[in-house]
Amino acid sequence: MHLNTLSPAAGSKTAPKRVGRGIGSGLGKTGGRGHKGQKSRSGGKVRVGFEGGQMPMQRRLPKFGFTSRKSLVSAEINLYEIAKVEGDVVDLSALQAAGLVKKNVLFVKVVKSGEVSRAVTVKGLRATKGAREAIEAAGGKVED
């Protein structure tokens, strides 16, 4: 076998359509675009969501809700993630140093998901009732 004898398998490659190259090609004259109209013109596209002048769906439906700005500075952390924090005291700066919450976060809540394996002191963070019980069961404590 030589490199100059290699060729793709039969039927695996399709030749590109040669549009507008004579009537005999089957794609000459109008080039598969039909006659006249917006879609036959160059650059003739209809915007996504355009319904021909009818009031579009995204404008017919009412607006709802908003994004709370508090969510930008709040975060949740799971119990099993506390194990990634070095030291016995888990507070906001320790979580940021471990890369578990972003730098702009001001409020963190510990959620019971997974389990905590060692005794830790959670300082200055909010905790759910289940998370608080799990931390205390492991010999740790939660300080507000």
Swiss-Prot record:
<keyword id="KW-0687">Ribonucleoprotein</keyword>
<keyword id="KW-0689">Ribosomal protein</keyword>
<feature type="region of interest" description="Disordered">
    <location>
        <begin position="1"/>
        <end position="52"/>
    </location>
</feature>
<comment type="function">
    <text>Binds to the 23S rRNA.</text>
</comment>
<dbReference type="InterPro" id="IPR021131">
    <property type="entry name" value="Ribosomal_uL15/eL18"/>
</dbReference>
<protein>
    <recommendedName>
        <fullName>Large ribosomal subunit protein uL15</fullName>
    </recommendedName>
</protein>
<dbReference type="GO" id="GO:0019843">
    <property type="term" value="F:rRNA binding"/>
</dbReference>
<dbReference type="GO" id="GO:0006412">
    <property type="term" value="P:translation"/>
</dbReference>
<dbReference type="InterPro" id="IPR036227">
    <property type="entry name" value="Ribosomal_uL15/eL18_sf"/>
</dbReference>
<dbReference type="GO" id="GO:0022625">
    <property type="term" value="C:cytosolic large ribosomal subunit"/>
</dbReference>
<keyword id="KW-0699">rRNA-binding</keyword>
<keyword id="KW-0694">RNA-binding</keyword>
<dbReference type="InterPro" id="IPR005749">
    <property type="entry name" value="Ribosomal_uL15_bac-type"/>
</dbReference>
<dbReference type="GO" id="GO:0003735">
    <property type="term" value="F:structural constituent of ribosome"/>
</dbReference>
<comment type="similarity">
    <text>Belongs to the universal ribosomal protein uL15 family.</text>
</comment>
<feature type="compositionally biased region" description="Gly residues">
    <location>
        <begin position="21"/>
        <end position="31"/>
    </location>
</feature>
<feature type="compositionally biased region" description="Basic residues">
    <location>
        <begin position="32"/>
        <end position="44"/>
    </location>
</feature>
<dbReference type="Pfam" id="PF00828">
    <property type="entry name" value="Ribosomal_L27A"/>
</dbReference>
<dbReference type="InterPro" id="IPR030878">
    <property type="entry name" value="Ribosomal_uL15"/>
</dbReference>
<comment type="subunit">
    <text>Part of the 50S ribosomal subunit.</text>
</comment>
